[in-house]
Design a protein with these regions (language model features):
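Pyridoxal 5′-phosphate
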Residues: 1-317
Length: 317
C-alpha cells in the first residue's frame, strides 16, 4: 500500500505513513512542531477548509497563522514571498485548489520557504492521480493526499509524506500504537518512535477503505498519470469552451497548464443545482459561487457536452 502511493509521488515507502484523512495526517505532522521565535504558519484562502482549520488549531500552542488572500482565484509565489521571513515555521500550499482547479507552483513556493530556512507542506488531494507529482524534483518537505478523489478509493485512507532527512527530527504527539518500533509493547513508560514516517501513524486502519484503495492505486499506476493528465486537459478545455459558447462564466484558469482536473462555472444557487443534476445522474459539486465538474480518465467528450449543456439550461431558467 505505502509502496504504491510512494511510487505515485516518486518517494520511498519509508517516507510514507497511512492515515485516516488529510485532516488527521496534517494534524499528526503539526503535533511534532514547537513554536518559539519561528512561530508563523503561512497559508492561503485557496486551500480546502481543513488545512485552515488545522493550522488555526495550532494557535493555542503558540503558532501565528498568516492567511494570504487570493486575487481573482489565484495565488502566486510572490504572494508567499511578501509574508515569509525569519519567523516563518511552515509554508502551506495546495497543489490544486478545490475552489476552481488552479494549480499552484509548488516548486517555486517551496523555494520561497527554503530561502528563509523554513519548510513547505503541500496538500495534493485534488492533484494526486491526475497531475504528475515528483516530491524530489519539486523539493517538497511534507505532502498529504487521500484516496477518495482521483485515486478511485474510499474515504478512510490518506497518506502523509515526510522527507527522510526530517523524519527523525520530529516527534509527534498525536500518535498511536502503530507509531512505535514495537506496537505490541504493553506497559510502555517511554516512547520509542519508529525510524520511518510510520512514527506519524495512529491506530488501526480502516481496512475496507485500504483494500479498495489499493485496487484504485493500481489502476491509476497502470493507466499512467501523464496519460491521464493529457486526457483530462482536453476534457476540461472542452468544458470551458462549450460553457463560454453557452454563456456560462468560469472562475477556473483559462491556461491549460494552470488548471487541474476540474472546471467551476458561476451559477445561480450552486447547491440547489447540484442536487437537481444529481437526480438526473450528473454528478457535480458546489463550491462557493461555483458549480464544479471534475472529469477523470474514464469520462468522454459526450459526458462533458451533456453536463455543460444541462448546467447552462438550468442556469438560464
Amino acid at each position: 500500500m505505502k509502496s504504491l502511493f510512494a511510487k505515485l509521488i516518486k518517494a520511498s515507502p519509508e517516507e510514507v505513513a497511512p492515515h485516516f484523512s488529510v485532516s488527521s495526517a496534517f494534524g499528526a505532522l503539526l503535533s511534532a512542531f514547537d513554536y518559539g521565535r519561528r512561530n508563523e504558519i503561512v497559508i492561503s484562502d485557496m486551500e480546502y477548509p481543513t488545512s485552515n482549520h488545522v493550522v488555526l488549531g495550532q494557535e493555542k500552542f503558540g503558532a501565528n497563522v498568516i492567511t494570504i488572500k487570493n486575487r481573482n482565484y489565484r495565488v502566486d509565489p510572490d504572494d508567499y514571498r511578501k509574508v515569509t521571513g525569519r519567523k516563518t515555521r511552515l509554508v502551506s500550499a495546495v497543489h490544486v485548489s478545490s475552489l476552481n482547479g488552479f494549480i499552484e507552483d509548488i516548486r517555486s513556493i517551496g523555494k520561497v520557504a527554503h530561502d528563509v530556512n523554513s519548510e513547505v507542506y503541500v496538500d495534493a488531494y485534488q492533484s494526486v492521480g491526475n497531475v504528475p507529482i515528483d516530491v524530489k524534483k519539486d523539493d517538497v518537505d511534507y505532502l498529504t493526499a487521500g484516496t477518495l478523489k482521483y485515486l478511485l478509493g474510499l474515504p478512510g485512507l490518506a497518506f502523509l509524506y515526510v522527507r527522510k532527512e526530517l523524519i527523525k527530527e520530529l516527534e509527534p504527539a498525536y500518535i498511536g500504537w502503530f507509531s512505535q518500533k514495537d506496537p505490541f509493547q504493553f506497559g510502555a513508560e517511554k516512547l520509542d518512535y519508529a525510524d520511518t514516517a510510520d512514527r506519524f501513524q495512529s491506530g488501526t486502519w480502516a481496512i475496507p477503505a485500504l483494500y479498495t484503495s489499493i485496487t484504485g492505486l493500481k489502476v491509476i499506476l497502470k493507466e499512467g498519470v501523464p496519460s491521464i493528465r493529457e486526457k483530462i486537459m482536453k476534457l476540461t478545455r472542452q468544458a470551458i469552451d462549450l460553457g463560454m459558447e453557452l454563456g456560462l462564466r468560469t472562475i477556473s484558469p483559462q491556461n491549460d497548464q494552470e488548471r487541474g482536473a476540474m472546471v467551476s462555472f458561476v451559477v445561480r444557487e450552486p447547491h440547489e443545482m447540484e442536487n437537481m443534476l444529481r437526480n438526473e445522474g450528473i454528478i457535480t459539486s458546489s463550491r462557493g459561487i461555483g458549480l464544479r465538474i471534475a472529469p477523470h480518465f474514464y469520462n468522454t467528450p459526450a459526458d462533458i457536452e451533456k453536463a455543460v449543456k444541462r448546467i447552462a439550461e438550468l442556469n438560464a431558467r
